[in-house]
Amino acid sequence: MRFFRSVDIDFIGNRYKFFTISGLLLLLTVGAFIYRGGLNYGIDFTGGILMRISFQNEVGLQDVRIAVEESGINSFELQSSGNLVMIRIKKDLEAQEEFETLIKSSIQLRFPDNPVKIEGIEYIGPTVGEYLSKQAVYAFLFAFLVMIVYVAFRFKSSLWGIVSVVGIIHDIVISLGFVILANKEINITIVAALLTVVGYSINDTIVLFDRIKENLKLLVKEDFVAVINKSINEVLVRTIVTSLTVFIVACSLFFFGGEVMHTFAYIMIIGTVLGVFSTIFVCAPLICEWRIKTNKRLKIAIKQDGVRSK
């Protein structure tokens, strides 16, 4: 901890290097999007079949996954609760009876000593999927709007609110890039994970902005760039330690939380790292870049006015 307190890293001086890293990650996301042919939407957004199957004895999800794959169905999701297993199939709704027979037969062959019973089947139509898609978009738009208004009000400038949302969008887009690279389906779990990442990311950003605001009042004679650098170095320990605790918990869920928590934890691991990166290497440098550009324009305007007055 003493090491972190004594460091004096020139974050702002190296801002273009960090902007380049962000740009490369965004290009990677675009490349993955093109290569995969877009986002791979799950049953929550496309519609399909939801089957609830109960076993006499508890079973492992991996064994159930193998049984479903052996029935010839590849696009599906699994979720379990005790002896009950839910199978979400992204398929044509007209073939529900065929899927029911195939899955039940395959599972019975896989678990001959564990009686299985189909508790129910639900059909999620395209209309429901479209509704959920709209709700997900509304959730993100509402979150962005609230963030802009809150940060702008707190720091008495809309610029700070806009920059904080730019950082959040940066985190979400790149997180989606890693989702695409891993060929994971976009479902409600991923939407929930991304909204959680938004919360952690904006929290880190507000902590840093608060310190910048305090130091701007205390260090009136200091250069703006120096104040930004000093503020980042001062909150560095807090940001790293807080994010590290979230990162460790997310890793625990990823490796030991089972299949249900795997996707959520995957997004949290990536999002936690990106949240720290965007706060320190994107948001703060953007504020500084805006101030530098504004001062340059102001000096040019004053110089031009002086020439005209002569």
From Swiss-Prot:
**Keywords in UniProt for this one?**
Cell inner membrane, Cell membrane, Membrane, Protein transport, Translocation, Transmembrane, Transmembrane helix, Transport
Which residue spans traverse the membrane? 18-38, 135-155, 162-182, 188-208, 240-260, 267-287
Give the UniProt subcellular location, in the record's own words: Cell inner membrane
Q: Report if keyword Cell membrane is assigned.
A: yes
- CC per GO annotation: plasma membrane
Q: Name one GO biological process term.
A: intracellular protein transmembrane transport
- What molecular functions are annotated in GO for this chain? protein-transporting ATPase activity
Task: Give the membrane topology, semicolon-separated if more than one.
Answer: Multi-pass membrane protein
* InterPro entries for this protein: SecD/SecF_arch_bac (IPR022813), SecD/SecF_bac (IPR022645), SecD/SecF_CS (IPR022646), SecD_SecF_C (IPR048634), SecD_SecF_C_bact (IPR055344), SecF_bac (IPR005665)
Q: Does the keyword Transmembrane apply?
A: yes
Which superkingdom does the taxonomy of this entry point to? Bacteria
This protein's assembly is summarised as: Forms a complex with SecD. Part of the essential Sec protein translocation apparatus which comprises SecA, SecYEG and auxiliary proteins SecDF. Other proteins may also be involved.
- Family under the similarity heading: Belongs to the SecD/SecF family. SecF subfamily.
Q: What does this protein do?
A: Part of the Sec protein translocase complex. Interacts with the SecYEG preprotein conducting channel. SecDF uses the proton motive force (PMF) to complete protein translocation after the ATP-dependent function of SecA.
This chain's protein is named Protein translocase subunit SecF
List the lineage, top down.
Bacteria, Pseudomonadati, Elusimicrobiota, Endomicrobiia, Endomicrobiales
**Gene coding for it:** secF
